[in-house]
């Protein structure tokens, strides 16, 4: 019985040595893998123990495969949770635009960089998918709806897989409620804006977005970009329901301000009657100058709008 003691001690020593060897993961390697992949320190440590610090490629591959499994499992587990927060994005490139609505459970996640990166990724994949799309003739925006499973990111990953990985990382249920693209007729430029301005440097994001198809025959006193930004903000703030037609101008003396010395025999001025309850965009009082209609403001800058889109987070 006593003869077996050295063997028992040997097993104990061997197990302790193995455990100590497993713990020998350098802080530098752990931080490098964490920075490269974005996965948790716990999983990065597991990968380094399994493959060693000299085989980072295998460690990264293992992490991605593990994350995919965890992400799909977590996505299924969290799938019934309500997603009442999130952001809507709008990204444009000349005559093509993408509008994506991504929802999550909390405002905290909606404001995170990881959430915005995911929304940017989806938005850019929609834009890339839509750019070569041909459209029929007409003067209105043409709309296309895509399934997330038909989209890939710049690395060729299916966007459904990308979404599941993000759910696994962020630990919240997320749903993509709107995946749309818009194309304008040739020669027309699309512009977009958001409110509040919660997006990235490249992509406007917010609770509200608007998109307009703008033509400008010649440069006005402000740039097309600035003009479009003003109209987009008007659309977000005033919630027009249709484009409509320009209101008829009438000759009237009522448009003249009453002032001392005014000649009552002077020619009447041309004014536009503006209804404060108007829901057609072109006939609404322009938000930045209520004495003008939107149509009049556009006309003063040699511009016109062919169509527009307004989206609010959670709307149908």
Swiss-Prot record:
Gene source species: Caenorhabditis elegans
Stretches the record annotates as Disordered: 245-269
GO CC terms, sorted: mitochondrion
Name of protein: Elongation factor Ts, mitochondrial
Function: Associates with the EF-Tu.GDP complex and induces the exchange of GDP to GTP. It remains bound to the aminoacyl-tRNA.EF-Tu.GTP complex up to the GTP hydrolysis stage on the ribosome.
GO aspect biological process, one term: mitochondrial translational elongation
CDD domains reported for this sequence: UBA_EF-Ts
Transit peptide range per the UniProt entry: 1-18
Family, similarity comment: Belongs to the EF-Ts family.
Origin superkingdom: Eukaryota
Pfam families according to UniProt: EF-Ts_N, EF_TS
